Amino acid sequence: MQVLILLSLAFLASCVVAYSRRRPGGRGAGDLPPGPPRLPIIGNMLQLGQNPHKSLAHLAKTYGPLMSLKLGNQFVVVVSSPEMAREVLQRHGLVFSRPFTPIAVQILGHGEVSMNMLPATSPIWKKIRKIAREKLFSNQALHATRAVRRERLRKLADYVGRCSGAMNVGEATFTTMSNLMFATLFSVEITQYADSDSDSGVNKKFREHVNAITRYMGVPNIADFFPIFAPFDPQGLRRKLTYHLGSLLELVQSLIEQRLRARNAATYRKKDDFLEMLLDLSEGDEYDLSVNEIKHLCVDLIIAGSDTSAATTEWAMVELLLHPDKLAKLKAELKSVVGDKSIIEESDISKLPYLQATVKEVLRYHPAAPLLAPHLAEEETQLNGYIIPKNTKIFINDWTISRDPSIWKNPEMFEPERFLNNDIDFCGQHFELIPFGSGRRICPGLPLASRMLHCMVATLCHNFDWELEKGTESKQLQREDVFGLALQKKIPLRAIPIKV
């Protein structure tokens, strides 16, 4: 159905935009990176398929690590090697520091204040990014909030211990991360585990909103390829995102208003959370910070923090259950270091090299964002001898880099051992492993995500033995994914925990 809509709209668009069918800047094809042949009007759109990260990886085998495509009216360059990723994110980082903002998310004023959508040269971006980096994700800030994370891990272990049969692992990790973000930001919890009688309609709606936002933001949008159709919202993405993002903004707005009213009371005692600190900053002289900026920042943090770490932990459990020998190695290491403690402390992580290797291998094998957030060229520049015109959209295919046999031995195999006794990490300096990006736009929440990934995987593996639900043992079935802003499992992992 989507293909028919696409072709019909492309035919209509041809009547309006045919006059502009030429290469960017009028240059000859020889100046631009190589790429596959294009159909009239729609270009290479049909070659993306349902899994663009895999389709682009296949095309890169023919056209190389710097490949050009035409997606409707958009000129796109796809980066598929560590060397070219370094050129884009580091050497030419300022030129490519502007994010591509899909038309469907240019709603509710979000694009005007969201640190995910503003260029790195924006004063607002610099201000909000600095606040997040220093006040929430710095080592000092994270040390101060370690008890909040420890309590969420305890609740996760308690919930799994209560399960008498197969449980939805991804739902449990999502609940853990969502509650962590709300406890850190607002000193409240928003969701309950599946066995709770208090799982209200509001809680279910919250899950629906976050899942819908990450799903719809990853859907290729005809209105982006042919901006002439933007007012008509042909796929309904703008309408859907307005509802789901608007609902989250309303939820956060209500929490902020409650706090503002409480702060006016003579008997008010300050909360030890991020919102309290932000409101204090908004009333001081150091930052010109508005309540509207606080609201949109909190929504950005909730969406990013709730979804990707939860999905990556679910993928980790998938691979460990499919590889019992790897799970046994991890459990033995945890037993030798942690002993009989049920909760793994963040200070234990540095003593657990196989746990660290397992997390790295999961991030390689199942990168949370298979295509890193796309960038735009602020000006014409050169990469590897090719012209990259101004306003070119840049995709970095992290999935391709992570599966490249010239970089990784046996890339299609899950082998944590490949990361033992080497210094490769995912902090943005080793471009063969950049699941969180690199350079100016590296994910600011990386330090928090790293702590929670290690601790959630360790908590689930140390306290329990696991069995896959009967009938779900197929590796092919378990590894099926759904493309989006985050790479989700197509079928949720259901597994049976057995208390050790």
UniProtKB/Swiss-Prot annotation:
Family annotation (PANTHER family): CYTOCHROME P450, FAMILY 76, SUBFAMILY C, POLYPEPTIDE 5-RELATED (PTHR47950), GERANIOL 8-HYDROXYLASE-LIKE (PTHR47950:SF4)
Cofactors required: heme
Organism name: Salvia pomifera (Apple sage)
Gene this chain is encoded by: CYP76AK6
Major localization class: membrane
Xref: Gene3D superfamilies: Cytochrome P450 (1.10.630.10)
Molecular function GO labels: heme binding; iron ion binding; oxidoreductase activity, acting on paired donors, with incorporation or reduction of molecular oxygen, reduced flavin or flavoprotein as one donor, and incorporation of one atom of oxygen
EC numbers for this chain: 1.14.14.61, 1.14.14.-
Domain of life: Eukaryota
EC main group: oxidoreductase
Name used for this protein in its record: Carnosic acid synthase
PROSITE patterns, sorted: CYTOCHROME_P450
Assigned keywords, A-Z: Heme, Iron, Membrane, Metal-binding, Monooxygenase, Oxidoreductase, Transmembrane, Transmembrane helix
Entry function: Monooxygenase involved in the biosynthesis of carnosate, a potent antioxidant labdane-related diterpene natural product. Catalyzes the oxidation of 11-hydroxyferruginol to produce carnosate. Mediates the conversion of miltiradien into miltiradien-20-al. Also involved in the production of pisiferic acid and derivative products from ferruginol.
Family: Belongs to the cytochrome P450 family.
Taxonomic lineage of the native organism: Eukaryota, Viridiplantae, Streptophyta, Embryophyta, Tracheophyta
GO cellular component assignments: membrane
Catalysis: reaction(s): 11-hydroxyferruginol + 3 reduced [NADPH--hemoprotein reductase] + 3 O2 = carnosate + 3 oxidized [NADPH--hemoprotein reductase] + 4 H2O + 4 H(+); miltiradiene + 2 reduced [NADPH--hemoprotein reductase] + 2 O2 = miltiradien-20-al + 2 oxidized [NADPH--hemoprotein reductase] + 3 H2O + 2 H(+); ferruginol + 3 reduced [NADPH--hemoprotein reductase] + 3 O2 = pisiferate + 3 oxidized [NADPH--hemoprotein reductase] + 4 H2O + 4 H(+)
